Amino acid sequence: MVKVSMVVQTDATNPGTDISKIIKSTNTIYGQYHFMMENLVCVTKPTEEGLEVHTCTQHMDAVQLMTSRALKMDQNKIDVHVRRLGGAYGMKISRTSQVAVACNLVAMKLNRPCRFIQPLTTTMRAVGKRLPCSNDFEVAVNNSGVIQYINTDIYEDNGYMLSELLANFGNDVYNNCYDKSKWNYKCYNTLTDTASNTFCRSPGTLENIAMAEWVLEQISYELDLDPLEVRLANLDTKYNELKEITETLKTNANYTTRRAEVDKFNNENRWKKKGLRFALLRWTPVGGQTLDVNLSVYHGDGTVVITHSGIEMGQGINTKAVQICAYLLKIPVEKIQIKANDTIIAPNGYVTGGSITSQNVGRGVKRCCEQLLERLDPVKAQMDNPTWEELIVNAFNLNVDLQAHGFVSLAETQVYDVFGATLAEVEVDLLTGEHEVKRVDLIEDVGRSVNPEIDIGQVEGAFIMGLGYWTTERLVYGSNGEVLTDRTWHYYVSQAKEIPLDFRVYLRKKSYSTDAMFGAKASGEPPMCMSVVIPFAIREAIAAARSDSGINRTKWFNIGNIAFLYIFRVT
């Protein structure tokens, strides 16, 4: 039995009347496992103060709080330590608390160390995935494909219970970058018989942005119009940055020439076809954070130590913090070190996630540096162009406090939009069902990047994770809700032969967010949403083949995100 409850409803404010066609359809996309290098682990040992917990979590405060409640221990007797994570993608926000509580219970009861390592198969069976999602919509358009009104009902599958309000994360982007005044939007939470689903890279936003892009794609098919022109015709005038981004991408990707080449290839080949498709993006970060940052300078050699509430899990948060500190203090990065995190130096810290922690840690580091420099300025004024080491020694001798604290609160939430555009070229072998991603060109607006190499790496990683989601990763459930694809023998993530042969990432130039974040924007989740361009390109290739078989090219067919070889046989 499926239980349904409404999350939010938004009504159109300016529907149109120039209606030449009404399209009704349903699109469904499915779950995704957070395929991490490091599974759920915890090591706990009793101490004279209580418990020393070493675990792999994105949320130290949650582990400490849940352990306190479950074991009826005071929080000040539970010290949670995290050095770094071997990947997380959202699973380690809440699900690590279950593992940690079990491990901590054993350590407390037996008064001896306990190590808990959950194997991959158990994790894939017991722990929830990305929310599957269905969209029932009715859209009315004119002859140019401009939306007059759209009624869209989004159903998010939370599993057997509602443990996190993930559907709310997509409420600001359900229309993506298109004219919001035409959209009647309803979002529902549903309960089914699978494990309770959880955060997964771009939770809520991927589903809503993909569904919006799906609608625009179907409009272009059924009216036989250029898909990019349909998108631009429906673009909200508030987001004109996307026109500039799209033109830049068309130029960089040599779109006009390649469009003609793809059409020529499809006309000359019967058993291999190509698709060339666009996807646009407007992504907005959700919520804020509570973060502590501490900066200490050692008087003997002037070296600097930073601790903060953020968790390093491959996104480069520590590297960016060091860069910001070195820039503001005008010292070499070699003199700065980031220490491991724990609930002693960073109590009550918010979860690391949502692609906002690197920016907020940077804000905290900036405040620490500003405090320290303010204290050092009077000392420096009395000296003749001192070195950093000389300045610190003199300041210490004058009893200057060489430790600073920066606090970032929920009240300081920054609101901005991340824009992007992607063009993908895919070739499909109609005899085997195999496909090859020939080339991907992607532009993302990351603001003024603190570290372009890290941001490009984040863009590439997120897109490839999305590529796997749309093409190779297929979750299969038994009739009782049991996961049958619980290992790499059955569940396939993108590997060397699935990634694009030619992958070109561009960062938008002359972009800026706010001074508080050095002009930087999020980079780790938005590209995940743009990966929907891959099934669009695959569908165009299949449509070309169907056309050769006498099937009307404007006849829509769904392929969703079920593993491509499977859906190819169905199509």
Residue map of PLM features:
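C-terminal structured "cap/appendage" subdomains that terminate the fold
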Residues: 518-535, 539-558
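Structural alpha/beta core scaffold segments of enzyme domains
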Residues: 1-443, 533-550, 569
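Short, contiguous acidic/charged loop-to-helix segments that flank catalytic cores in large enzymes
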Residues: 309-313, 454-458, 525
